[in-house]
Design a protein with these regions (language model features):
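Helix-loop interface residues and adjacent transmembrane-helix termini in multi-pass membrane transporters
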Residues: 45-46, 106, 132-134, 188-189
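Loop-to-transmembrane alpha-helix entry segments
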Residues: 80, 113-116, 132-152, 159-166, ...
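Conserved small/polar residues in nucleotide/adenosyl-binding loops
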Residues: 231-237
Length: 241
């Protein structure tokens, strides 16, 4: 009893997951992500790496603002304590974001969306393998039925897309699933800094590849700053049980 009280004061006991709150955040994030293809298709002249750079800049500004509002002067210290797994999560998220742009610009929006629909199944399989989380048999049957339907839709979309684009969409799904597993495993750690580091990785790579061509039209710049859905990916993963 004394130990539990001491741990509570120190902050080691994790609050119970708020499932409803997490589901709302996941719904918001998924809804915004579903419009990403439409937004990118309306970009006039910017190439993939220009879009990556300015999207990462927009995400970085939003996430840094949230971190500063939440922690104030102690926010910089949060960037130092994410550890090795936090760094891996940042790298996976950066990889997934870059792969998403490659997919959406090299195949159809439908083919990309169908492939990304496999994220819940990939994540569940990874959670079972790496975290030992159990999956009920009825859930497995439901997942298999849904996966079969998604596979049919994906096969129908292959004819209008490219092999490269579809492959990048699959890599994007793998990256997001791997990121979700790391976040799930580290629920007691503030993981918003991983989003900041992932954006820094993307910006660094984009600058290397297109440092001499960073000028965009006002229309393209505005569209690059529109999506902010990835800020909703951390809390739901940590809280859904």
């Amino acid at each position: 009893m004394v130990v539990a009280t001491m741990n509570t004061k120190i902050g080691y006991i994790e609050p119970p997951p708020r499932r409803a709150y997490a589901m709302i955040l996941m719904l918001i994030g998924s809804t915004v992500i579903s419009f990403s293809g439409l937004v990118i298709r309306n970009i006039d002249a910017a190439d993939n790496w220009q879009i990556n750079f300015y999207r990462a800049l927009a995400f970085g500004i939003v996430i840094s603002t949230i971190l500063l509002l939440r922690y104030g002067r102690s926010a910089p210290r949060k960037l130092k304590v994410i550890g090795f797994e936090g760094a891996c999560a940042a790298a996976l998220l950066a990889f997934a974001s870059i792969s998403f742009l490659q997919a959406i610009t090299n195949t159809t929006v439908a083919a990309t969306t169908f492939t990304l629909s496999s994220i819940p199944f990939l994540t569940a399989a990874m959670a079972w393998f790496f975290l030992g989380e159990r999956i009920g048999k009825y859930t497995v049957f439901t997942m298999l039925a849904a996966a079969f339907g998604i596979a049919l839709m994906f096969i129908q979309g292959l004819g209008s897309g490219s092999v490269y684009g579809n492959f990048m969409a699959f890599l994007c799904a793998m990256g997001f699933s791997g990121y979700a597993i790391i976040i799930r495993r580290n629920r007691g750690l503030e993981m918003l800094p991983t989003l900041i580091f992932s954006n820094l990785i993307i910006m660094f790579l984009a600058l290397i590849l297109c440092w001499d061509n960073m000028m965009l039209s006002l229309n393209d710049l505005i569209l690059c700053f529109v999506p902010v859905s990835y800020t909703h990916l951390t809390l739901p993963t940590k809280r859904i049980v």
